[in-house]
């Protein structure tokens, strides 16, 4: 007989699709980062610096994981010229891929 554990989810939790968690093409690091990104508020600072500030991963490590997520179409990073002429990056994050 198998035990079943239930967790009461009454506050501070995230609801997300299992799609990326079950995608065998993604590494555990990519699954973890995507899950973490999906748990953040929409107005959060989605940037390489922002992600590094809340992780023990190095800048190159985060960049590598983001590249993997881009290759599998879970993340798009758009490069746009900002108001002062500097480049800015917009992150589009997908729970499901088509």
Where are these regions (language model features)?
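Charged low-complexity intrinsically disordered patches
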Residues: 93-98
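N-terminal leader segment of winged-helix/HTH proteins
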Residues: 1-11
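Winged helix-turn-helix DNA-binding recognition segment
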Residues: 20-30, 37-91
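Short, Lys/Arg-enriched N-terminal segment that forms or immediately precedes the first helix
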Residues: 10-24
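Detector for methionine-enriched segments
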Residues: 1-2, 16, 37
């Amino acid at each position: 007989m198998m035990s079943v554990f239930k967790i009461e989810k009454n506050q501070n939790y995230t609801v997300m699709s299992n799609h990326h968690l079950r995608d065998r093409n993604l590494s555990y690091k990519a699954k973890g980062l995507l899950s973490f990104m999906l748990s953040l508020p929409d107005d959060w600072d989605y940037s390489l610096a922002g992600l590094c500030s809340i992780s023990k991963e190095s800048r190159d490590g985060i960049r590598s994981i983001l590249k993997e997520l881009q290759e599998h179409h879970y993340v798009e990073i758009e490069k746009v010229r900002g108001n002062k002429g500097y480049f800015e990056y917009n992150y589009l994050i997908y729970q499901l891929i088509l």
